[in-house]
Amino acid sequence: MVVIRLARGGAKKRPFFNIVAADSRNRRDGRFIERVGYYNPVASGAEKGLVVNTERLAYWEQNGAQLSPTVARLVKQAAKAAA
């Protein structure tokens, strides 16, 4: 099953997350199919904290991908900010 979830990157104490479409059997930070966006919880100033490619996200959802609870919350937050 394909899931859309967060893959952690960044340095110690400086988290950065890629929003990826991946097979559910792969590790959290392991192999993924496609990068759909990113989330930077420590963004400040002019940096963007959340970027999501909504076209690709919709494509994966139409093809049966499940969103993790955190990604679902972030997508809802991004849609609210865009409106």
UniProtKB/Swiss-Prot annotation:
The keyword Protease does not apply. InterPro entries: Ribosomal_bS16, Ribosomal_bS16_CS, Ribosomal_bS16_dom_sf. One of its GO terms (molecular function) is structural constituent of ribosome. GO terms for biological process: translation. One of its GO terms (cellular component) is small ribosomal subunit. Keywords: Ribonucleoprotein, Ribosomal protein. PANTHER family: 30S RIBOSOMAL PROTEIN S16, SMALL RIBOSOMAL SUBUNIT PROTEIN BS16M. Belongs to the bacterial ribosomal protein bS16 family. This is Small ribosomal subunit protein bS16. The lineage of its organism: Bacteria, Pseudomonadati, Pseudomonadota, Betaproteobacteria, Rhodocyclales.
